C-alpha cells in the first residue's frame, strides 16, 4: 500500500509543471481593502470565497513559481531554495485537489479550509529559509552585481506575493472557521475596520522596549502626536490590518532603539523617540524620529537590500542581540507598506538621527493590493546584463594636476 501512495504522489508531482504553465498565463486579481471587508461582512458566503480562492491562489502561486525558475542556477541549486520550491509545488497540488469539487458540499468546504491551514503552516518558514538560501549562495560564490540585482528584484516580488497569499488564506480561515476571536470581536478576518493607529504604535513600542531593556538595560521614551486634518477633534482611525502595521512599527522601533542606545552609551539620559501620525485626504502618514546618530546617504539604499545587513546573522544559542537579524526587517517592512499602495522611506542625517516615514492610503477604496505578475516585462528583467555606467566614477586617488602645467 505504501508503494501505491508513493506512486500516486510521484504522478501528482509530475503534473505540477502543467498546472504552473496553465495558471501562470492568468494575471492575479488584486482586491481593495473595501472588497476584503465586503467579502467578509455578515452576509459572507463561504461558497463564493471557495470558488474564488481555488482559482486565484493557483494563479498567484504559479506566477511567482515561474519567476523562481528565472533565478541564476547557482541560487536555484542551493538546498534552501530547492526546499522552498518544493513547498510551493506541494501547495499548488493541494489546491488542485479542489478544482472540480462541488462547492455545495459542506464536507468539501471544511476540507478546503483545513487544506489552507496546512498550506499556511507549511509556508511559515519561507522567509528565513529563502534568506538562508541567499546566504548559502553568497558564502559559496561571493558577490556578483548582476545576480545581486536579479535576487533583489525577485525577492521583493516573491515576498510581496507571499504576503498577498497569506492575506487571502487568513481571511478565509479566520472568517469561516466558525469562531470569533474574543480579543478582537469586531475584526473582519485579520482586518480592523476601526484600527487605532496610536494603539498599534504603543503596542509595537512596548514590545521593542521590552527587548531593548532586556539587552541594553535601558531604552528611550516614546512621545506621540496626532494631527487629524480631516477632523481635528477625533483620534485617528483607519481600515487596516493591525498585524501588518505592527510589523512595520516594531521593526522601526527596534532599529531606532538600537541606534539611540548605542550612540548615547556614555550619556546619563536617552533622547526620546518621537512619533507623528498625520491624516490627510489621501494619505495617512506615520513619522518616527530618533536621535540615533543617523546613517550616511550612500548607505540608505543598502538598508533595503537583502544582500546586506548592518549586524551579523544571529546563530542559535549564541546570545546575539535580539534587535538585529538577517537584515530582512526593513525590506519586508517596506513591502508590507507597499502591499496596499503605501510606502516606507528613510530620511537620515548622519551625526544626528533618522526619520522613518510610513505612508498608507487613508481610504479603503484606494488601498488596493499591489501584486507581481509574470509577463514579458518581468522575464526581460532577469535577462538584463549589467552594462558600463554612463556617469564618471570618481578616482580613489587624487589626480596629480602638476602633469598638466604649461612649461
From Swiss-Prot:
GO molecular function: ATP binding; identical protein binding; protein homodimerization activity; protein serine/threonine kinase activity; protein-containing complex binding; pyruvate dehydrogenase (acetyl-transferring) kinase activity
Predominant location: mitochondrion
Keyword Hydrolase in annotation: no
Keywords carried by this UniProt record: ATP-binding, Kinase, Mitochondrion, Nucleotide-binding, Phosphoprotein, Transferase, Transit peptide
Annotated catalysed reactions: L-seryl-[pyruvate dehydrogenase E1 alpha subunit] + ATP = O-phospho-L-seryl-[pyruvate dehydrogenase E1 alpha subunit] + ADP + H(+)
Free-text activity regulation comment from the record: Activity increases in response to increased acetyl-CoA and NADH levels and upon binding to the pyruvate dehydrogenase subunit DLAT. Inhibited by ADP and pyruvate; these compounds interfere with DLAT binding and thereby inhibit kinase activity. Inhibited by dichloroacetate. Inhibited by AZD7545; this compound interferes with DLAT binding and thereby inhibits kinase activity. Reactive oxygen species cause the formation of disulfide bonds, and thereby inhibit the enzyme.
Function in brief: Kinase that plays a key role in the regulation of glucose and fatty acid metabolism and homeostasis via phosphorylation of the pyruvate dehydrogenase subunits PDHA1 and PDHA2. This inhibits pyruvate dehydrogenase activity, and thereby regulates metabolite flux through the tricarboxylic acid cycle, down-regulates aerobic respiration and inhibits the formation of acetyl-coenzyme A from pyruvate. Inhibition of pyruvate dehydrogenase decreases glucose utilization and increases fat metabolism. Mediates cellular responses to insulin.
Quaternary structure note: Homodimer, and heterodimer with PDK1. Interacts with the pyruvate dehydrogenase complex subunit DLAT, and is part of the multimeric pyruvate dehydrogenase complex that contains multiple copies of pyruvate dehydrogenase (E1), dihydrolipoamide acetyltransferase (DLAT, E2) and lipoamide dehydrogenase (DLD, E3).
PANTHER family: [PYRUVATE DEHYDROGENASE (ACETYL-TRANSFERRING)] KINASE ISOZYME 2, MITOCHONDRIAL (PTHR11947:SF15), PYRUVATE DEHYDROGENASE KINASE (PTHR11947)
Name of the protein in question: [Pyruvate dehydrogenase (acetyl-transferring)] kinase isozyme 2, mitochondrial
Lineage: Eukaryota, Metazoa, Chordata, Craniata, Vertebrata
Gene: Pdk2
Amino acid at each position: 500500500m505504501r508503494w501505491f501512495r508513493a506512486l500516486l504522489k510521484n504522478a501528482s508531482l509530475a503534473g505540477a509543471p502543467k498546472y504552473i504553465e496553465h495558471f501562470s498565463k492568468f494575471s492575479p486579481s488584486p482586491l481593495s481593502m473595501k472588497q476584503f471587508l465586503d467579502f467578509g461582512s455578515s452576509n459572507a458566503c463561504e461558497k463564493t470565497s471557495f470558488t474564488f480562492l481555488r482559482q486565484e491562489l493557483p494563479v498567484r502561486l504559479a506566477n511567482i513559481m515561474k519567476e523562481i525558475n528565472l533565478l541564476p542556477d547557482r541560487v536555484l541549486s542551493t538546498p534552501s531554495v530547492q526546499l522552498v520550491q518544493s513547498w510551493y509545488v506541494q501547495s499548488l497540488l493541494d489546491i488542485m485537489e479542489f478544482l472540480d469539487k462541488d462547492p455545495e458540499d459542506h464536507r468539501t468546504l471544511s476540507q478546503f479550509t483545513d487544506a489552507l491551514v496546512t498550506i499556511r503552516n507549511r509556508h511559515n518558514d519561507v522567509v528565513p529559509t529563502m534568506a538562508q538560501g541567499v546566504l548559502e549562495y553568497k558564502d559559496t560564490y561571493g558577490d556578483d552585481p548582476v545576480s545581486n540585482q536579479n535576487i533583489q528584484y525577485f525577492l521583493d516580488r516573491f515576498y510581496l506575493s507571499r504576503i498577498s497569499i497569506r492575506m487571502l488564506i487568513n481571511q478565509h480561515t479566520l472568517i469561516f472557521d466558525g469562531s470569533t476571536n474574543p480579543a478582537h470581536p469586531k475584526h473582519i478576518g485579520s482586518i480592523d475596520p476601526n484600527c487605532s493607529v496610536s494603539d498599534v504604535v504603543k503596542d509595537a513600542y512596548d514590545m521593542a522596549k521590552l527587548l531593548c531593556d532586556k539587552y541594553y538595560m535601558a531604552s528611550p521614551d516614546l512621545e506621540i502626536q496626532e494631527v487629524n486634518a480631516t477632523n481635528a477633534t477625533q483620534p485617528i482611525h483607519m481600515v487596516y490590518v493591525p498585524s501588518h502595521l505592527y510589523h512595520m512599527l516594531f521593526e522601526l522601533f527596534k532599529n531606532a532603539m538600537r541606534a539611540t542606545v548605542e550612540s548615547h552609551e556614555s550619556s546619563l539620559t536617552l533622547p526620546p523617540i518621537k512619533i507623528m501620525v498625520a491624516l490627510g485626504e489621501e494619505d495617512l502618514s506615520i513619522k518616527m524620529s530618533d536621535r540615533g546618530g543617523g546613517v550616511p546617504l550612500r548607505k540608505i539604499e543598502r538598508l533595503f537590500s537583502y544582500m546586506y545587513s548592518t549586524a551579523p546573522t544571529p546563530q542559535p544559542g549564541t546570545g546575539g542581540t535580539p534587535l538585529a537579524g538577517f537584515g530582512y526587517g526593513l525590506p519586508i517592512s517596506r513591502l508590507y507598506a507597499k502591499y496596499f499602495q503605501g510606502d516606507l522611506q528613510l530620511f537620515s542625517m548622519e551625526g544626528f538621527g533618522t526619520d522613518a516615514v510610513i505612508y498608507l492610503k487613508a481610504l479603503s477604496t484606494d488601498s488596493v493590493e499591489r501584486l507581481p505578475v509574470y509577463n514579458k516585462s518581468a522575464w526581460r528583467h532577469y535577462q538584463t546584463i549589467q552594462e558600463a555606467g554612463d556617469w564618471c566614477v570618481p578616482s580613489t586617488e587624487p589626480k596629480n594636476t602638476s602633469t598638466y602645467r604649461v612649461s
